[in-house]
Amino acid sequence: MARAKRVKRDSVTHIYQTCKQAGTCPPDVVNKVEQTTVADNILKYGSAGVFFGGLGIGSGRGTGGATGYVPLSEGPGIRVGGTPTVVRPSLVPEAIGPVDILPIDTIDPVEPTASSVVPLTESTGPDLLPGEVETIAEIHPVAEGPSVDTPVVTTSTGSSAVLEVAPEPIPPTRVRISRTQYHNPSFQIITESTPAQGESSLADHILVTSGSGGQRIGADITDEIELQELPSRYTFENEEPTPPRRSSTPLQATRAAGRRRGVSLTNRRLVQQVPVENPLFLTQPSRLVRFAFENPAFEEEVTNIFEHDVDAFEEPPDRDFLDVQRLGRPQYSTTPAGYVRVSRLGTRATIRTRSGAQIGSQVHFYRDLSSINTEDPIELQLLGQHSGDASIVQGPVESTFIDVNVSENPLSESVEAFSDDLLLDEAVEDFSGSQLVIGNRRSTTSYTVPRFETTRSGSYYVQDSKGYYVAYPESRNNAEIIYPTPDIPVVVIHTHDNTGDFYLHPSLRWRKRKRKYL
């Protein structure tokens, strides 16, 4: 009997991903993946009660913590007679400070019989300081700013060393200056002064002028750039009028445009030509076909298709757009006269068969736009023009001063003061004896001037060459106004007549015929 071959078990991760959704995972697979085994629980709960932080494990210093390392050769026994030696790894110390060691001589003891007072000018013992100490001062220059030479002075007098070092210069500090400007279009500063050497600022422009020539320093300049003069803010150029252009970029095409497919709009044999004068044709042509509300936010730039009812007859707003079913999008072209033409190709649905087919002609609706003539340029005057020279008027230099003593006036006794009321004109104009003359240059007609009744003799001046003369007659003829009678026939009825007869109005009488009966 052959022994069955043992099949290797799949990985724990793959088994857990497959059987987790179905809930058929073995317990050992779930515990291993979710870390709930016995060993995991011991580490999880044991770490909460035991703390190994003081041993320095994992600190990265390599010193073994506070207790150090214990050699592996020694057992766990206890040493007798002394403190256990702590073994630490050897660390290379870094040398700090000067390496040279200065020798110091020993001091001889002072005898008991010697005086306790030590004079300052005498030296009883050896000198504690060395003879000469070599001192080197290094000063690193600052990278920013100009370099400053700092002298180092070393003075040696006797056995004392005195070092005089100049104070270190203060390094330059960076200063950041910010500028905030708010533009006000209604306010503009205009400041002009006499041009001189220097720099001046005008609003946001900086103008640097120099009265004398410049001097070139260094090697010769090989490349010279031609500079153009910038016009001043008060200089305007007069442009000559140019003929109107047909397009914004009047460039000739490199190759001739191919022949377009379809029917030409200007073919009078196949397309009906209809000029349109209504301005709605440019913005909303659909309002010319049928009545609709105006929508100013909608611009018709596409093809419009209109559906008409067969049984109903609709009169369009414009008679030229009768039975229009389809109105194409706008097309722009140029006429031989140079005008811009806006065209739309429309189709009429004049006849409709029983099958539903519509038959109609094609119509070319167009409108020529008026040309914009180029007017002559208007010469503008400069506002606030300055010559650039400042005029200084000094009053004390150009004026003459006269010292007059007002307190003492020798003529004050002989001068009489009059009131200002004497200057008023109290005469009353009544226009008595005035004359009215109305002149005219065209006519020299003479008029008879009657004599007016007056108590005083009046004088009249008659112009021989020109003028009108107005005369007022003494009597007037008032015409009597006669009001006409009404045109309505009046029927007169006599109430006192008891005969029963009446007066017949002439308009009610029987008219005789022109010819009598035969």
From Swiss-Prot:
Similarity field: Belongs to the papillomaviridae L2 protein family.
PTM note: Highly phosphorylated.
Motif (Nuclear localization signal): 1-10, 510-517
Annotated region (Disordered), positions in chain: 235-261
Domain of life: Viruses
Pfam families assigned to the protein according to its UniProt record, in alphabetical order: Late_protein_L2
Organism of provenance: Human papillomavirus 36
Subcellular location: Virion; Host nucleus; Host early endosome; Host Golgi apparatus
Name of protein: Minor capsid protein L2
Function recorded in the entry: Minor protein of the capsid that localizes along the inner surface of the virion, within the central cavities beneath the L1 pentamers. Plays a role in capsid stabilization through interaction with the major capsid protein L1. Once the virion enters the host cell, L2 escorts the genomic DNA into the nucleus by promoting escape from the endosomal compartments and traffic through the host Golgi network.
GO MF annotation, one: DNA binding
Keyword Phosphoprotein set for record: yes
Subunit structure comment from the entry: Interacts with major capsid protein L1. Interacts with E2; this interaction inhibits E2 transcriptional activity but not the DNA replication function E2. Interacts with host GADD45GIP1. Interacts with host HSPA8; this interaction is required for L2 nuclear translocation. Interacts with host importins KPNB2 and KPNB3. Forms a complex with importin alpha2-beta1 heterodimers via interaction with the importin alpha2 adapter. Interacts with host DYNLT1; this interaction is essential for virus intracellular transport during entry.
UniProt xrefs under InterPro entries: Late_L2
Main location: virion
GO cellular component: host cell; host cell endosome; host cell Golgi apparatus; host cell nucleus; viral capsid
Name of the gene this protein is made from: L2
Keywords per UniProt: Capsid protein, Cytoplasmic inwards viral transport, Disulfide bond, DNA-binding, Host endosome, Host Golgi apparatus, Host nucleus, Host-virus interaction, Late protein, Microtubular inwards viral transport, Phosphoprotein, Viral penetration into host nucleus, Virion, Virus entry into host cell
Cysteine pairs bridged by disulfides in the record: 19-25
A biological process term (GO) from this entry: microtubule-dependent intracellular transport of viral material towards nucleus
Phosphoprotein listed as a keyword: yes
